[in-house]
Amino acid sequence: MREAAAALVPPPAFAVTPAAAMEEPPPPPPPPPPPPEPETESEPECCLAARQEGTLGDSACKSPESDLEDFSDETNTENLYGTSPPSTPRQMKRMSTKHQRNNVGRPASRSNLKEKMNAPNQPPHKDTGKTVENVEEYSYKQEKKIRAALRTTERDRKKNVQCSFMLDSVGGSLPKKSIPDVDLNKPYLSLGCSNAKLPVSVPMPIARPARQTSRTDCPADRLKFFETLRLLLKLTSVSKKKDREQRGQENTSGFWLNRSNELIWLELQAWHAGRTINDQDFFLYTARQAIPDIINEILTFKVDYGSFAFVRDRAGFNGTSVEGQCKATPGTKIVGYSTHHEHLQRQRVSFEQVKRIMELLEYIEALYPSLQALQKDYEKYAAKDFQDRVQALCLWLNITKDLNQKLRIMGTVLGIKNLSDIGWPVFEIPSPRPSKGNEPEYEGDDTEGELKELESSTDESEEEQISDPRVPEIRQPIDNSFDIQSRDCISKKLERLESEDDSLGWGAPDWSTEAGFSRHCLTSIYRPFVDKALKQMGLRKLILRLHKLMDGSLQRARIALVKNDRPVEFSEFPDPMWGSDYVQLSRTPPSSEEKCSAVSWEELKAMDLPSFEPAFLVLCRVLLNVIHECLKLRLEQRPAGEPSLLSIKQLVRECKEVLKGGLLMKQYYQFMLQEVLEDLEKPDCNIDAFEEDLHKMLMVYFDYMRSWIQMLQQLPQASHSLKNLLEEEWNFTKEITHYIRGGEAQAGKLFCDIAGMLLKSTGSFLEFGLQESCAEFWTSADDSSASDEIRRSVIEISRALKELFHEARERASKALGFAKMLRKDLEIAAEFRLSAPVRDLLDVLKSKQYVKVQIPGLENLQMFVPDTLAEEKSIILQLLNAAAGKDCSKDSDDVLIDAYLLLTKHGDRARDSEDSWGTWEAQPVKVVPQVETVDTLRSMQVDNLLLVVMQSAHLTIQRKAFQQSIEGLMTLCQEQTSSQPVIAKALQQLKNDALELCNRISNAIDRVDHMFTSEFDAEVDESESVTLQQYYREAMIQGYNFGFEYHKEVVRLMSGEFRQKIGDKYISFARKWMNYVLTKCESGRGTRPRWATQGFDFLQAIEPAFISALPEDDFLSLQALMNECIGHVIGKPHSPVTGLYLAIHRNSPRPMKVPRCHSDPPNPHLIIPTPEGFSTRSMPSDARSHGSPAAAAAAAAAAVAASRPSPSGGDSVLPKSISSAHDTRGSSVPENDRLASIAAELQFRSLSRHSSPTEERDEPAYPRGDSSGSTRRSWELRTLISQSKDTASKLGPIEAIQKSVRLFEEKRYREMRRKNIIGQVCDTPKSYDNVMHVGLRKVTFKWQRGNKIGEGQYGKVYTCISVDTGELMAMKEIRFQPNDHKTIKETADELKIFEGIKHPNLVRYFGVELHREEMYIFMEYCDEGTLEEVSRLGLQEHVIRLYSKQITIAINVLHEHGIVHRDIKGANIFLTSSGLIKLGDFGCSVKLKNNAQTMPGEVNSTLGTAAYMAPEVITRAKGEGHGRAADIWSLGCVVIEMVTGKRPWHEYEHNFQIMYKVGMGHKPPIPERLSPEGKDFLSHCLESDPKMRWTASQLLDHSFVKVCTDEE
C-alpha cells in the first residue's frame, strides 16, 4: 500500500519523540478537550501488570516517593513500546477514552498521594482522625481503580491475540521489546535528510525595549486609554517584519514536522519487524539498492510465454485433457478448441506474471514512507512512461479480475457448474474484491434466494472498487491497439462470442452444426433459471437485478475497450427513455478527471498482454441470451387454440412486457458493442435469431390484438372504453415497432385493418339489428292477431331501433376517432411525380439552396433538406426516422415548422436518371442514423418524390411552399399519404370502408322506412296508425341524427380524391333527409322545431367544395329543395295543419307535434331570439307589422329559382310583399325574418365528444364546373340560408332625435366614468366599517357525528344529524392549539362571511360549537357532490344555462353584501338532490371595507386557484389590486368546465405555467360547441380589462341565462 505509512502519521500537534516523552516530567492536566498523545494513547497489558505487581507486592520495601517515580516512568515508556498498537476501531476508541480519563485524574491523585505520604513528617494537627479516614478512603478507591484497570488489560490482551495477524509471526507470547533510542538530529541512512541538510534555526529577534517615559504625571484613565489604543492598532495591522518571521517559523516547523513523521514511520517499521531502529535503517538502505533494477524490469516487462507449450500439451484447462474434451464434443475442430484453450492459458500466464510484477512494485513502494520520497530519490519512477506503464498494468489486472469474477457469479446464478465446458473464458484467480461479500454461496436451485442474495452482495461489490490507491478508476475511451497478431488470433477464432450459432466452444462459425447441436437448444441451459425467475419475480424485476449486478463491470470494461473517442452521432443509439421504468441506460460522457487518466494501449501492445474483450463479449451475450430464452419461453407458451376473452388481456400484457424487455436488452447489447467492435453492423448480424424471435412475438401480439377487438365487438355494449383501449395499444406499438425489423409497416397496416374492421362491424351490427327487429315483429304477429299485441310489438321495436341507432352511433364515433388518429400519425408525406428532366429539378434545388443528405451505404437514396437544416443534424435524423416510420411527434414539439425532407430512390430502372442524380456537385451532409432506420430506408419502395415532415399538421404548409418553389417541374399525386407504401394502401382501404359505412347507414334508414310504411301499416288498425306513426318518426329522426353526425365526422378523415367521393355522399344524404321532411313531417308554426336542429346544422356544414363539384342542374335542384324544406319546416304561425296530419284526431294519445327523439335535449321549449338579441314584444308596432323589404331576399333567390307552390297548402316560400305582410295576423316576426334568424344561428357542432379536433386543410379544386359558377352558387346558397334582415328599424323624426340625444348623453357619461371623473348614484349608504359586528352564532340543538366525507385545507368534514329534527347537515371540524389566534381569526372571518346571508344558492350556515382545541362549524349538506364531478364528461347546453344562472345569482348576492369569494371553481360549487346549485367554501373570501365602492382595486392579496384566476389577480393590476370582477372571470372558467368537462388550461400541469399564460394576456379558449349566446356570455366574463368586464347584475340580464328554473 502506497499511502499506508502516510495514513499512520499523527497530526503535527502530537509529533513528540519518545525520548522527549521519557525525559520530560508528567504533563499538567490538559485543558478540555485534551488531545491524547499518540505515544501514550493506551496502557498496554504488560505495563499494567508490572504496575500491579510493583504497587502491591513491593509496597513494604519501597518508599512511597520512589514508588511513585517508578510508576510514572514505567507508564510513559511502556505506553510507547510495551505492546502492539490498537488494531480495531472499537479498541482504539476504548483506549483513547481510558487514556483521557487517566490523564484527567492522574495528576490530582499523585498530588493527594504525596500530601498523604508526607503527612507523618509534619507536626501533629488537630483533625488527625479525619486524615486517617481520608487515607483509608483513598486506598479503597485506588484498589478499585487497579481492579478495573486489570480487567481492561485482560480484555485488551484477548483482542490483541485475535489481531495478531498484523504482527510478524513470533512464537510464544509477545516479548517485551527494548525501548529504542531515537534522536531527531541523528542521521539515518534510510531517511531523506541528514544533519548536513538540517536547516539552521532562525534566532528570534530580540525586541527593542520601548522608550521609558515617566507616567507619574499622567492620570490613570489616560494611561488606560493609551494602552487600549495601542492594542487595537496592533491587532488591526501586521508589519512586514512580523510576516517574514512567521514564514520563517512555518518553514522551520514544516521541516521538523516531516522529520518527525519520517522518524515515527521508521520506528513503526522497526517495531513491526522486530528490529532495532539502527538495524531497520540499515535493512531499508540495503533493500533500496535493488530499486533501479526493479524499475528497469517494469519498464522492459513483457509477458513470457516460454512455458506455454508445455502447459498446453500437458493438460487442458481445469485439469481436463484435450483428448477428453474432444471426445465430449464430437465433431469439434481441434483448431477451435486449441484456440480457446490457448487464450485461457495466455490469460493465466499473463495474469501470474503481471501479478508478480505488481507485487514487486508494491515491495519497493513499501520501502519509503511516501511516494514523494520515492520519486525524489528515483526520477525514473516519477517519469511519465513509467507511470503510464504502471497504470496500464493496473487497468488490465483489475478489469481481468473483475470480469472473471462476474462470469463466475453469473454461472452460479444461472446454475451452470462447468463454465469452461460451455466456452466461458474463466480461470482460477483470487477474487478482485473481499470474498466476504462478493462470492455468495448459493444453495440448491432456488432462483429467488439466489437473486436476493445476489442483490445484497451486488450492492457491496458494486460500491467497492478495486482497492489500489495508485491508479484512479479508468473510464476514458482509449485507442485500443492490441498486438495485431494476438487480436487476429482471437477475433478470427472467437466467433462464438459474437454469434448465437455456437454455444459450446470458440471455434469457427459452423462449429455448432458440426458438433451436432440443434439450434433449438442453444440457450436451453438458461431455461430452468428463466422459467423459475419469470414465475417468481417477472421479467421486469429480473432485468433490474441482472442490470444491477453486471452494469458496473461492463461499463468499466467498455470504456477501456473503445477504440476512439469520437462523439457519437445523434440517435445513432436508440433513446432508452421509453424503457425508464425498467432500467435507464447510462450514457453519461466521461468526466474531466476520467479523461485525464487516459491509458495508452501501446503499453499493452508492448507488453504482449492478451485482451479481456472475450470475457466482456461473453458477459454481454449472456444477458442477451437470458432475455432471448424468455422470448422463446413465451412463444412456446402460446395457447394452441383461440384464447378466451377472460385470458386474452393477461396474454397481451405478457407480450408487451417481453417485447419491451427484449428491446431494452437489445439496445443495451448494441450500446455496449457499438464502439468496441470495428464493424457497427457486426452485432446486428449476430443477433438474427433474436431479431427473428422478437418479430415472431410482435406478430403474436398483433394476433392477440385483432382477436381481442373482435371479441369486444361481439359484446352488446362494445362502444364502452373501446377507443381508449385502441389508443393505449397504438401508443405502445408506435414506441416499439421502430426497433423491430419490418415492424413499422406491419403495425400501421394492422391498426388500419382494425379500424376498418370496426367500421365494417358497425355496419353489420346495424343490419343484423334491423333483421332481428323485423323477425321479432313477424314472430309476434303470427302468435297473436290482437291489435293491442301488435301495437305493443311495434312500440317495442321502435324503442329497440332507437337503442340500435344509439349504439351504432357510439361505435362509429369511436371507430372514426381512432381512424382519424391513425391518419394524423401516419399521413406525414406528400407524393409528387417528376414532370421535367432530373437536371432541371437539381438546378432549381441548387438555386433554392437545398442541401443533399447522404447516408453511408444508401447511395441510391437521394435526400434533400432546406439549407436552414444544414447544421441541424439532429433534426435531419429525426426526419429520417419519421420517413422510416418512427413516431417523432413527441420529439418535434420545439422543431421549426419548415423542417421537411425530400426523398426519392432512383434504383436501376433508368441509367440516365441515375447519372443525372449524380451530377450534384455541392458537399453533402453525412449522417449516420440508427441501424433500424437504415434497414427500413434500404427496403423502402419509393417510385416518385416524397416530401416528408414530422407532424401531419405541418404538411399542408410545407407542400404549398414547395409547390410554389418548383412550379411546373413536379405534379402532385397524393396531397397526403404515408411514406410507407404498405401503410398508404391500408389507409386507402380504411377510407373506402368509411365510405361504405355511409351507404350502409343510408340503406338502414331506408329499411326502417320500408318496415314501418309497407310492412307494419298492413298489420295495424287505422285507429292505432297515428300512435304508431309517432314512434316511426322517432326512430327515423334517431337514424338521421346518427347519419348526420357520421357524415360530418367522416369528412375530416378524407383527403385527396376521397373528399370528392364523400362530398357526393354528403349531398345525397342531405337530399334524402329533405325529401323525408317534405313528405313525412308536418309544416312548422313559425318557429324552428327542435328535431330539425341537427338537420339544419348538417345543411350548413356542407362545404363549398362539395357544391362547386355539382353540375348546374343538380345545384339548381338542390337549392330549390333546400328552399322548400326550410320553408316547410319553419312554416307560418298558426298555419293550418297540412300534409299527413290532416287525419289526426284531437284525442290522439300523444301531442300533435313531432316528439323529441333520443338524441334531443330534454328541454322541450326552445326560445329562438331575434338577431338583435331582444324580445319581439319590445319592438315598436311598426317594426312588428312591417317585414324586411322583400326585394333583397327575392332578388337573391329569383336569380336561380322561380317560385313554386309548396306541396301542402300552396303557400309560397318566397318572401311576401309588404302589403301581404300586413295581412298576416299574429305574426311577431315575418316568415323570412324568422328563417334568417334561424339560419344565422346554425353552425357546425359535432355531436361526438370522442372525436379529435378538426385539422386545418386546404380544399382541393375539382375539375367539374367552372370557378365563377362555383363561387356564385356558394354565395347564393349561403345567402339563402344565412340571410338576415336589416336591423335598422324605421323611426319617426321625434323619436329619432330623442334616441340620438339619449345615446350621446350615455356615451358622454360612460367616458367620464371611465376616466374616473364622475361616479354613480348608489341606493346603499356609505359604510366604512371594517368588520361586521355580529357575534358567532352558537348551536342550540343536539347533534350526532356521522361518516367522514372530505378533508380540506382547514379541516375535515363529516356528516352530522340533528337529533331534534333529524335533519342531515355537514360538520366542518377545525383543530387548533389553545392559543393559536391565527387559526381562530381565519375561522372567525369565514364565519362572519357566512352570517347574515341566507339564499337558496348559497350554502347555509347553522352555527358553531367552540371547544378548547377544536371548533365545529355546522353547514348545509349537499348530497349530490360537486359540479366538478358532475361535469367531467361535459353537460348539455340547457343544463349549463340553468347552472350558470344559479351561480350568477349566488355571486350577485355575495357582491351585493360586499363579499368577494375569490375561489369560485367547480369543486366549490355543490349540487343538491332538488337540482339547486349552491356556492360554498368561503375560506378564501374577503369582506370589502366599503360596499358602495365601485373601483376595481378593492383587494390586494392573492388567493384562489390558478386555473380560475383573473389576470388582475395574477399581475396585481400594477399595484391597484382586484375586486369583485375577479369572481366574474372565475364564473366564465366554470362555464368552460361545464362545457368541456375539463378545467381551463388543463393542458398545463403546473400553476406557474397557467399564471404566466394568463398574466401575458391570454384567455381560455371558448368551446366551439357552445351556442353563439354562450360564446357571447363568455366573452363578457373573460374580458381582460376588469373595468370592461360585466358585473353579476349585468350578466343576469344576458339571454344566455334567461331560462326557467322550474323546468324539468
Swiss-Prot record:
Which GO molecular function annotation, any one, does this entry have? ATP binding
The Gene Ontology biological process annotation of the record reads: chorionic trophoblast cell differentiation; intracellular signal transduction; male germ-line sex determination; MAPK cascade; p38MAPK cascade; placenta development; positive regulation of JUN kinase activity; positive regulation of p38MAPK cascade
Q: What EC numbers are recorded for this enzyme? A: 2.7.11.25
Q: Which residues bind ATP?
A: 1349-1357, 1372
Family the entry assigns: Belongs to the protein kinase superfamily. STE Ser/Thr protein kinase family. MAP kinase kinase kinase subfamily.
Question: Could you give the subunit structure recorded for this chain?
Answer: Monomer and homodimer. Homodimerization enhances kinase activity. Interacts with TRAF4; this promotes homodimerization. Binds both upstream activators and downstream substrates in multimolecular complexes. Interacts with AXIN1 and DIXDC1; interaction with DIXDC1 prevents interaction with AXIN1. Interacts with GADD45 and MAP2K6. Interacts with ZFP36; this interaction enhances the association with SH3KBP1/CIN85. Interacts with SH3KBP1; this interaction enhances the association with ZFP36. Interacts with CDC42.
Q: What is this protein called?
A: Mitogen-activated protein kinase kinase kinase 4
